[in-house]
Amino acid sequence: MPSLEAVEAFLVMNESELLQDFLVGLIAAPQLAVFFEKYPRLRKIIDREWPGWQRRLRKRIHDTNVPDDLAQEFTLYQHQLLLGSGEFFRRLPATLAALDSQGSPFSHKAHQLCPDGKITHSDSFHTLFLQQWRLSLVARTLTLHHQVMEQEREMLQQELQQRMQLSGALEPVLVENENAAGRLWDMSRAPTHHGDYQLLVQYGDFLAGQPELLQLAERLGRSRAADPQDHADTQLEIRRVLVREPAVMPEEVSGIHQSDEILRLMPSELSLLGLSELELEFYRRLLEKRLMTYRLQGDAWREQQIQHRVTYRHHQQQPKGPFIVCVDTSGSMGGFHEQCAKAFCLALMRIALADNRRCYIMLFSTAIVQYELTADSGIDQAIRFLSQRFRGGTDLARCLAQTCTLLQQPTWQQADAVVISDFIAQRLPEETQGLINQLQKQDGHCFHAVAMSPHGKPSIMKVFDYIWRFDSGIKGRLLRRWRH
């Protein structure tokens, strides 16, 4: 059974134009126009979806088979095209009967062209019959095409509305620039429920109410400057220069010299011809080109192309490395500590989206749970992370050991390791401390400690490059509220 794509191609229908009209109509929907006015950043991002939509629609058309009755009529039409004029007229009654039995919409028009079985055996009738039949097939194919496109339109509009609703709700929380808006839009493909992403919105509101926590995340997230890289590029270039050389037509006297140029003889040489005794001497010197003559010459300038090597040095900023965030989920980190830790991770996720970095979360207590908030399914993983409850023990050493294992892989070059904890834990093993020290000195990795309590153990925190303190206790909260 032929596909819709094959029938359209045989009938010489412009599929690209049909798809273009469909997509233009989709974007011009009133619901989308209102949304684009509210979130103009997403309008540019939608344009990137066109190639994917076109591939999706073409695949749907390719996979859609035409109905049996249309397939039978299309096959009959193809056979008629292969017949000569005489054979066509001989089989015409059988063709009309086949159209009647198939219930073809063209059957009525075919009988109108052959009233009472009277058929004019001419090439013009043959051509007219096939043209009218083709028009009927094109109309049926277009109807089927529009039905398929209408189904796709409904699914695409529903998908777009869900993604735009999600992107619009999370834009104030996660979007800082155009790059972040594009990555959020790509992440919105993963299915999520309305009630789920509201958790992200709630923590975004909480973060907005804690400006010191947000500022701390900004300072930590952008504390490492992007490493510049010099790139030398040597190539051959053509340089045009002006070269001075003697002119073909002399312009001025520049001295005297020996030559045979009669027109430039000095008067003393001409005097030799006046004495018969010296006349032979004159001719001898003429043959030897030893006559004293004026030297006349001028300057001319000519453009000359010279090839030379030129080295260009490009100073290019390299992208920053990813975040590996270790979050303490022990019981002592519950309550307000838990809210602050989750909001801090959300702020780092926002920075990672804006700076095109990865944000990898590791929850450590008695077991280690991992999430990547900037993956394609990052929104779903962020929701699952925010839904976690902090009720376990503390195994900081195990988490740091696993972090060091990750940092030794090429994927995690220039990564920043961030540990969010109250740092009320057991002393780190000497082996782990030595490994951290090696990663800091040899590989340039930075280890940050975000202390949620003023009672953290100094013996643990001394291994970190930077210590960022945020007092999430009652006293710290009261002081921050009093300042504001």
UniProtKB/Swiss-Prot annotation:
Name one cellular component (GO) term: cytosol
Instruction: Provide the protein's localization.
Output: Cytoplasm
* CDD domains assigned to the protein according to its UniProt record, in alphabetical order: VWA_YIEM_type (cd01462)
One Pfam match, given by its short name, reads VWA_CoxE
List, alphabetically, the InterPro entries matched: Uncharacterised_CoxE, Uncharacterised_ViaA, VWF_A, vWFA_dom_sf
Q: Which domain of life is it from?
A: Bacteria
Disulfide pairs here are: none
Recite the UniProt keywords alphabetically: Chaperone, Cytoplasm
Q: Report the sequence similarity comment from the record.
A: Belongs to the ViaA family.
UniProt xrefs under NCBIfam families: PRK10997.1
HAMAP family annotated for this entry? ViaA
The record's subunit annotation is: Homodimer. Interacts with RavA.
Q: What does this protein do?
A: Component of the RavA-ViaA chaperone complex, which may act on the membrane to optimize the function of some of the respiratory chains. ViaA stimulates the ATPase activity of RavA.
What's the protein called, per UniProt?
A: Regulatory protein ViaA
Q: Which organism is it from?
A: Edwardsiella ictaluri (strain 93-146)
Corresponding gene? viaA
